[in-house]
């Protein structure tokens, strides 16, 4: 958890970073601009994943930026400043969804891959020097094909898995923010959690959470299968999707997502908890907490406060014809925290065009940094990047940019956020994409990294 500094200029772009707080891609050293994930380092450097230019199958790489935003060309050992993520599958389309720093100084990179007819998730583990750790998986790489999730021998699933937990992706319109959908998280003892969805023989979609050992092998001590299916007991739901995951210090795992009711006229979001053995934890308010009647809702992120184990969940929902950022706080036991918005979910519409929360970071004083994309969730001229600081009770912090939030808005393009994190000194780092109108549909014209003062 980050200790905030709350300076007088909090929420304004940091002029010491790149060009007055904004680094635009491509840059002379890097042809690509599709930024994907970001991680800050203790020495104030930044790891950034992006896809290079060149079309289908172009390399996916990790770059390391110095504190001032310049490329660290010593990274990777070949003078390029880049490390290519190789999964042993030529011409596969890859992305990077998460970068983790391991307790031994090494690194774990998680993403998705696709090469017809196969697709799935991958994990690549590196030593501290960014050489492959060949003790992990097969020579440093573990592939988890979607078709293998939920082995049909055990749970009667047909093995068919969806490639995205975002049902809106089928509309054909470009999403304004990159839905990470399947997520991964590493536990303190090295266990790795993956979430996604599977389809039953009856056609019902259900979320799934899998646990791997630190060497990449399946952990069969988790629910005796290596995975657990999200059932949402007591809810007559049609489908449920996983969108977020978080692990407590005691090894219990929280999974969040959305569901549609059986009558097709409603739904909402859920947070459910499994114990360290993969069983539904009924001490968590019966096992599952829901926010119902949140039409068109998503639960994009879950964070846990170290101090008291309380849980912050954020996403979005439709309210009065516009998308609203949605956030709620639960106690460690799964009850709504009365200290936040009087124990009710907080729906925020800070700009007229609506908004979504995609990421949040918890501060030591109880404040919450939240960031997302404005608009209706798709790449239109309404898409900008909004970042806010909320006080522990859910109200906006007026010391952050003078009104509690700030909007990143380039003149010629419209913007979407991909990822957000925070440096140890509280400065906020975000990466995302620039979009432009084309003859057929909005297209990606560039990428960016920005840094805000704390």
Kindly give the residue locations of the regions a language model identified.
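Extracytoplasmic mature domains of secreted or surface-exposed proteins
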Residues: 1-454
